[in-house]
Amino acid sequence: MKNKVFLVSMCLLFVSNVKAQDIKATEVRVTEQFVPSVPEASKLNEQATFSDTIKVDKSQKYTVSEHSLKADYKTRPLKAAKVKTETISKLYNSKVFFGTGYRIGSKATIMHNSNRSKDLNYGVLLNHFSNKYKPEGFQAKNSKNTLHLYGKKINAKHIFIANLDYDRRTALYWDKSSTFEEEQFLNNRFAYTKFTVSAISKENASNKMIRNVTFFASDLNEMSENQIHLSADLQKEINELPIDLEIEFNDYINYNNKDSKYQATEFKELHFVPKASFEKFGIRFETGLNLHYDPNGIAISPIIKATKELVKDILLVDGGIRHIEKRNTLKSLADENPFIHSYGSNQSILGEHGFMQALETTSGDELYLLMRNVLGKDEVFEGAVAYGMIDNFHNLQRVNNGDYNRFKIGYVDVKQLHLSVKYERRVSNILSVNAYADYYSWDKKVYYKPNFVANISAPINLRDKIKVEPSINYLGERYYNEISQLESQFHANLSLQYNYSKILSAFLQLNNLTNSKKELWRNYQEIGFNGVFGVSYSF
């Protein structure tokens, strides 16, 4: 209590004046109403960004010092690394196919190939086909058997190739009302054998001119027709100008079999085709001459070819003058029409009124222009036009000599216009489209030659497991005499292939789904609808 009284007393005794500012009241008038608001805030980026301005100096400074390391151990030498190629898929050496079906007697294929080798390959291929059908009032049988043997040997300087081919075809179209009981007298048979050897040079030395040589000898129906062929291709560069020389010799011998009633005939011909290639104005030129010699005289034809790639790998144009030549033989006629008159070809024949086929050479020169255009990925279009004079243009004529109603060859000189188109497109990994068409126009009537031929197909591939290919074929009208024509033919076909595995697969082919039964040749009707089913096995 005493302390409190003392403290108050001291404060009263030591009072002093304190100076202070006298602040008067200020009047504030608000003329507008204040509306409080909060501004919108933008969202901040949750991911921080930064940039490093520090640069790493990658330069290095070093010096080389020579000294030996003293160690009490020895290092093991490393072996060189070995690079292995990808494993090659296994190949099967052999394949067997057999099938049969409606109006198809049998169809078979046997194939065998050697194992992979760098210097030796060989193989064999056999095919068999036969059918049987009964047109109204007739009976028809056909068969075709082929054998192909091949071998290829490769050494340091050359490639040697040898082939042996055998082709036997029979064709029977028998009138049921015929009084002849034995079919052999009405059956056409053509057995053809051909042996070929070729040598191809791998040397590119300037002093090596011969690039390849080919020799073959053939026989039809036991020396009823023989051909001996020898050809060579020589190349040489003269003053930086590539020169190519093709030499070809052919000897055709007919009716030389011992039982022939006709005198043997022989026709020899020799070809020389020198050509030079050069480039000018961005165009690739190939010029030359075709020199032909035979007993009828010497014929010379020009060869001019110009090739220009207007757009690299896209648009190619090719045009010029070309020579066409083909020797008509009994073999070529039989391939075109197996129902030709076959007198003197070593087979059973009725009657004594036979004749030899007139075998001539068809030749000519024509102007041509070809274009190839890549329209897009996996899409290509090709078109060509050609016009020229054809000497000895061959066409077949029906001749009924009392014993046989068959065909012989005839000739006419014509002016020919030929247009052709080809289109290929891979639409997807599953579907493709292929189409082609040929149109011909002649200034004279020719027999059994269509003006228009077309084909379109659409292969479907389902992962290589199932393959389907529908196709449509059209064959235009053909004159068989001066005023009459054979009707055009329209065929729809369907093929199916199911691959159960790489070893086993099944096949179904349906031909002529519209069951067209029109005449292929005058008085020779086509087979109509037919089909074949088969299986194949690889091992």
Please report, for each region that a protein language model flagged, where it lies by residue.
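Bacterial Sec-dependent N-terminal signal peptides
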Residues: M1-I23, A458, F529-F539
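N-terminal periplasmic/intermembrane-space "pro-region" immediately following the signal or transit peptide
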Residues: A20-E86
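Short loop/turn motifs that connect adjacent beta-strands in outer-membrane beta-barrel proteins
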Residues: K84-Y92, R116-D119, I154-I159, K202-M209, ...
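Exposed, low-structure sequence patches enriched in small/polar residues
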Residues: L91, V96-G99, R284, G288-S301, ...
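Surface-exposed extracellular loop regions of Gram-negative outer-membrane beta-barrel proteins
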Residues: S114-Y133, D244-E246, K261-H292, R426-Y436, ...
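Flexible loop and strand-edge segments within Gram-negative outer membrane beta-barrel domains
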Residues: N131-T146, N163-K208, F215-Q227
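Outer-membrane beta-barrel transmembrane domain signature of Gram-negative proteins
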Residues: Q184-S198, R211-F281, V414
